[in-house]
């Protein structure tokens, strides 16, 4: 499926100079959303995944249906102060600023094989931080899946040595 048909291009959002790739039209089309989920599930099935991890918020949108289809758990990565129990944290840079990400300390057991999912690979800061959290807990990053990659931002260089699936590139 040509997923680009289901991704809206929004100039100057969230600020001037940014060309936002909006995945909500893809999610609004059940067949397209299912096809994207199925493509990631097919990729994950070859990697013996124990748990899916996704950063908020759009990583949840991708990761939850994938974890459901794989019959494995989903571990959310959230901004500081959003998870109720003991967490580990990491500071990170993103396309337009800096922030802190957290994951529950018991979300991943040492040796578990993890699939990280997110909607978009831009500069790579969010995923690099998510990888650090997973690996600090002893998880093995078995794969990383994105709907969209913005190749001109070179985020892929942050993922050298990791197996990456991207459904559409810009």
From Swiss-Prot:
Keywords noted in UniProt = Cytoplasm, Glycosyltransferase, Purine salvage, Transferase
Q: Which domain of life is it from?
A: Bacteria
Q: In which pathway does it act?
A: Purine metabolism; AMP biosynthesis via salvage pathway; AMP from adenine: step 1/1
Catalytic function, reaction form: AMP + diphosphate = 5-phospho-alpha-D-ribose 1-diphosphate + adenine
Name the InterPro entries for this protein: Ade_phspho_trans, PRibTrfase_dom, PRTase-like, UPRTase/APRTase
Q: What is its main location?
A: cytoplasm
Q: What does this protein do?
A: Catalyzes a salvage reaction resulting in the formation of AMP, that is energically less costly than de novo synthesis.
Q: Which NCBIfam families match?
A: apt, PRK02304.1-2, PRK02304.1-3, PRK02304.1-5
What is the name attached to this protein's record? Adenine phosphoribosyltransferase
Which species is listed as the source? Bacillus mycoides (strain KBAB4)
């Amino acid at each position: 499926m040509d997923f680009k048909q289901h991704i809206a291009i929004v100039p100057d959002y969230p600020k001037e100079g940014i060309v936002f790739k909006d995945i909500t039209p893809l999610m609004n089309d059940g067949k397209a959303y299912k096809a994207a989920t199925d493509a990631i599930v097919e990729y994950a099935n070859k990697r013996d995944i124990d748990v899916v991890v996704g950063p908020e918020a759009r990583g949840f949108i991708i990761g939850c249906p994938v974890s459901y289809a794989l019959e494995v758990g989903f571990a959310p990565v959230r901004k500081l102060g959003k998870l109720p129990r003991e967490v580990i944290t990491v500071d990170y840079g993103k396309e337009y600023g800096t922030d802190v990400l957290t994951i529950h300390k018991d979300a991943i057991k040492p040796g578990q094989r993890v699939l990280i999912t997110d909607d978009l690979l831009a500069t790579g800061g969010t995923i690099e931080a998510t990888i650090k959290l997973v690996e600090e807990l002893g998880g093995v990053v078995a794969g990383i899946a994105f709907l969209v990659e913005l190749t001109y931002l070179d985020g892929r260089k942050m993922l050298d040595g990791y197996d990456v699936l991207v459904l559409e590139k810009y």
